[in-house]
Amino acid sequence: MKPIRLTILGILTPLLLGCSSSAGSYPLDLPAEDYITTLEINDIENFTICVFNDLHISVLTNLTDEIAYYEKCLISNGGELPSLIVLNGDSFMGAAKSQVERFFDWIDSKGVPFAYTYGNHDLQGTYSNMLIDQVIKSCEHAVLLNPINDNVFGDSNYVLNIEEIGTPNTLKWQLYFYDSNTYYGVDYDVIHEDQIAWYEKQQQALEDLGTPNIPSLTFMHIPTEEFEEAYKTIGHNVTSGHDTADTESLWYMGESISWGYKETEFYETMQEYKNNKAIIVGHDHVNLTDWHYDKDEGSADNMIHLIYGLKTGRGIYHDTRIMGASFYTLKDSNEFDIKWMNVPYEEDPFEITSGYLIGLGEGAIA
C-alpha cells in the first residue's frame, strides 16, 4: 500500500455538544469545507477501496470468529490491505457497547483510513445514539465527519478528497458519504432535500475553486428508486444477466429492491452536475448489481453506475454464493474498476465473474 497522509479540515469548536448559545443559532449553515477530509497520496493509480456491507454485528455474534473473517475479506484482493475501508451501513444491529468498541479497536489497528455510513439498523443497540459517532471519532484512522447541530439531516454526510501529492497537490477524486436515514413510518426513509442541497453546495464550492470537473463516487446504505427503474428497463425483471448488447450492465437479483418511501431528485441532481460516477449501496443482502443507468438518456458519459455491493459475513440472512467484500480501484482517467470477491469462511476467496453471476439465476440473459 502506498503511503497515505490524512488531513482533517474545518471541525469547529462551536460544533461540540454543550456549546453555549452565544456560538449562534441552530441549525448551523456551515461552509462546504467543514465537511471535507483529505487523503494525500503519492499516486492515484491503484488507489483501492474495500467496502463492507451489512455486517449486522449483534449480541449473538461471536466477534472473535467474525473478525477473523473480516481480516480474510480485507486481504482477499491479492493479499494486500486496501488504501481505504468503507463500512457502508448496518455494521450493527442489536449489538452491545463493548462489541462496538472492540470492532472499532480492531479496524483502527489495521492502520488503514476508514469511512463509515449509517444504515437503518446501526442505532438499534444497547448504547446511546451518540456512541458510534464518539467511538469512531476517537480512532486515529477514521475519516468520518459529523458536525453537530448543522442543517443537514442525518449523521454521516461528508466528503473525502483524494489528493495526489505535488506542488501544489492535485485533487483527483471525491468520495461522498450519506446517511440514507432509517424509517418513515413503516417504510424506509430517503435522502432528504437538505442533503441534496448540501451536495449542490459541495459542487458549487468546486466551481468556486476553479475545479468543477472532479469525478466522484457516492456511498450510502439504502438504494434509490433508480435501482428499481434500472432493473425494469435494463434487466427486464430477469433474475440475473449481463447486458453485453447495450449497457454492459451486470446483475444478480436475489430479492426485491427496498428503496425509500418516495421518489426524490437526488439522482437527477447528480446527473445534472455530471461528476458522480456511481451510487454504491448495501441494504438488500442478496442483490449484486452494476447497472449502467442513464436516466435522462443523454450522452454516454452521463451514465451513473448503480451498484449493490456484496454483503459481508453471515449476520442475519445471506447467500454464501455472493458474500464477501467489494473492491473499487480508482483511475486517473476518471474511471474505476470493480472487483467482487466471494469470501467463504472455510475455503479460499475467489473473484465473482460475469459468467458465475449469470449462472446463479434462472432464466438469465447473457
Give the ranges of each region predicted by the language model.
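Binuclear metal-dependent phosphoesterase catalytic core
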Residues: 26-30, 36-37, 159-163, 266-268, ...
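Active-site environment of divalent metal-dependent phosphoester hydrolases
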Residues: 58-60, 92-96, 116-127, 183-186, ...
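Beta-strand-turn-beta hairpins that frame and shape the catalytic cleft
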Residues: 37-50, 155-177, 214, 292-306
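Acidic/histidine-rich helix-loop elements
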Residues: 50-68, 92-98, 125, 130, ...
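His/acidic metal-ligating clusters that form di-metal
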Residues: 78-83, 174, 188-288
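C-terminal motif of bacterial Sec signal peptides marking the signal peptidase cleavage site
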Residues: 15-18
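Extended active-site neighborhood of metal-dependent phosphoesterases/phosphodiesterases
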Residues: 30-32, 99-211, 306, 326-331
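N-terminal active-site segment of His-dependent metallophosphoesterases
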Residues: 22-102
